[in-house]
Amino acid sequence: MDKLLIAADNALRTLFARPRAAQPSPARGLPEGDLSPAQRREAGALMRVNHVGEVCAQALYMGQAAVTRDPALRARLMEAAREETDHLAWTAERLQALGSRPSLLNPLWFAGAFAIGWTAAQVSDAASLGFVVETENQVARHLQGHLERMPPQDAASLAVIERMQADEQRHADDARAAGASDLPAPARVLMAAAARVMTATAHHI
């Protein structure tokens, strides 16, 4: 019960409170780019997708941490979630700077990711960590695509994405080192398909 109450409190904070970063944003000190209205809209849409990804990361780690009985793994998951809070704050700042907004479907994304994390952790800690590896690898590839699509004048957003990509890859490496099992191919395919639906929807809504 305590774990569920903590998860509910974290969900409310993630979805409705202003996130506070423990580390300064990589965008700090960088000038805002001279973007056309179309470029600004596209940069905002891309950053909204990234913000959704961080909402989902929070939910995924919380769902896993609520289930695992291994204190060391729980601490590892919560530390990763704290780093994702930095990402959440940084992407929220970029959304505001670009005159954009978070996805209106964030509660839905959060609920789905929490359920996935909870379910994966019910199987085994190794499967749970395998889910982290695959998720973070997919996010890192997705961020690489955003580095290529983001208007080059938006140095602030590019700096944030580059840092996030490095952090996500490190999370994947840490999870593998902690004993992650490889997910079966059908699970990876389903995850990629779900990610495509999420990113396409969040780009607009």
UniProtKB/Swiss-Prot annotation:
Record's catalysed reaction(s): a 5-methoxy-2-methyl-3-(all-trans-polyprenyl)benzene-1,4-diol + AH2 + O2 = a 3-demethylubiquinol + A + H2O
Free-text cofactor note: Binds 2 iron ions per subunit.
Bilayer topology annotation: Peripheral membrane protein
A GO biological process held by the record: ubiquinone biosynthetic process
Subcellular location per the Swiss-Prot or TrEMBL entry: Cell membrane
Listed InterPro entries: COQ7_proteobact (IPR047809), Ferritin-like (IPR012347), Ferritin-like_SF (IPR009078), Ubq_synth_Coq7 (IPR011566)
UniProt main location, coarse: membrane
Assigned EC number: 1.14.99.60
Protein name per UniProt: 3-demethoxyubiquinol 3-hydroxylase
Source organism of this protein record: Paracidovorax citrulli (strain AAC00-1)
